[in-house]
């Protein structure tokens, strides 16, 4: 049974044993003017619940990323538990684009694999698809904690594991990652402009004034923004704790999230 995500993504189907030889053939067809210089491996993991349209959008984002940071892209599409024994299914694609900076053509390798239950053999296969002398970053999109748990040991060799808390929830980030400091939350990254704006506002006040008499801080959020809200609340708590330390003040405030977003733009602390 063809995997809907692999079926929807661009590329040509190949046998598992022919993936790397097919990649070499694709490069040969592009000619000598195609630049082949990768900086990293990017493994894009899709959970079984990701739609074909969502996968296509994330694949396009990964290709745009590769245009700035040349990489080998490996796409892993998980099958539902009911299809755990389904055979592996692969695709290969070489996406080329003009690079004005180099005045030539640059290409991105994309290897795609639909798989069932993770096994040691599957991990070994994926490892052979990676460029061994380059760092590996993992982007887990729509991957549940149960789906990623079998990959935890394998992820020890990865420099970064990134996911979106608003999609995967807190439980994903509570997994026992071998290198917790290498795990990043995309929801937190998206809030950088908000943190910068709040930081400028807070910088206009003395640290002691910010924490004096403060009883509570609540970050309210709309649907689908729980990850951003959690990251912002943690950042606020860190800032105010630092302010208390600088001013030698006592901070006795509660920090909470609220799923009932108030209307309009506002910032409230009591």
Language-model features: locations:
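Conserved, well-structured core segments that form the ligand-binding/active-site neighborhood
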Residues: 108-209
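Residues at beta-strand starts and edge strands
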Residues: 38, 213, 265-267
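An N-terminal, globular interaction/scaffold subdomain
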Residues: 1-139
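Structural alpha-beta junctions
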Residues: 63-75, 130-137, 155-162, 237-253
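Short connector loops at secondary-structure junctions
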Residues: 75-85, 250-262
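Long, compositionally biased intrinsically disordered terminal regions
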Residues: 240, 245, 260-270
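Residues that cap or initiate secondary-structure elements
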Residues: 48-50, 223-225, 263
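ATP/pyrophosphate-binding catalytic subdomain of soluble kinases
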Residues: 191-257
């Amino acid at each position: 049974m063809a995997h809907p995500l692999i079926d929807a993504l661009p590329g040509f189907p190949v046998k598992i044993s022919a993936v790397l030889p097919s990649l070499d053939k694709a490069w040969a067809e592009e000619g000598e003017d195609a630049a082949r210089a990768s900086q990293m491996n990017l493994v894009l993991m899709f959970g079984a619940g990701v739609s074909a349209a969502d996968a296509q959008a994330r694949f396009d984002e990964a290709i745009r990323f590769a245009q700035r940071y040349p990489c080998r892209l490996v796409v892993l599409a998980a099958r539902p538990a009911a299809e755990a024994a389904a055979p592996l299914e692969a695709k290969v694609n070489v996406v080329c684009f003009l690079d004005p900076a180099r005045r030539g053509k640059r290409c991105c390798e994309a290897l795609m694999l639909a798989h069932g239950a993770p096994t040691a053999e599957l991990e070994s296969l994926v490892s052979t698809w990676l460029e061994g002398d380059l760092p590996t970053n993992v982007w887990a999109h729509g991957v549940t904690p149960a789906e990623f748990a079998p990959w935890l040991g394998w992820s020890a060799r990865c420099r970064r594991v990134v996911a979106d808390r608003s999609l995967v929830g807190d439980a994903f980030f509570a997994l026992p990652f071998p290198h917790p400091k290498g795990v990043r939350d995309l929801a937190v990254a998206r809030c950088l402009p908000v943190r910068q704006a709040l930081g400028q506002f807070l910088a206009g006040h003395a640290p002691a004034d910010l924490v004096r008499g403060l009883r509570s801080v609540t970050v309210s959020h709309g649907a689908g923004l729980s990850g951003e809200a959690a990251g912002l609340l943690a950042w606020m708590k860190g800032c105010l704790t630092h302010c208390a330390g600088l001013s030698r003040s006592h901070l006795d405030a509660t920090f909470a999230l609220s799923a009932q977003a108030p209307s309009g733009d506002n910032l409230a602390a009591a």
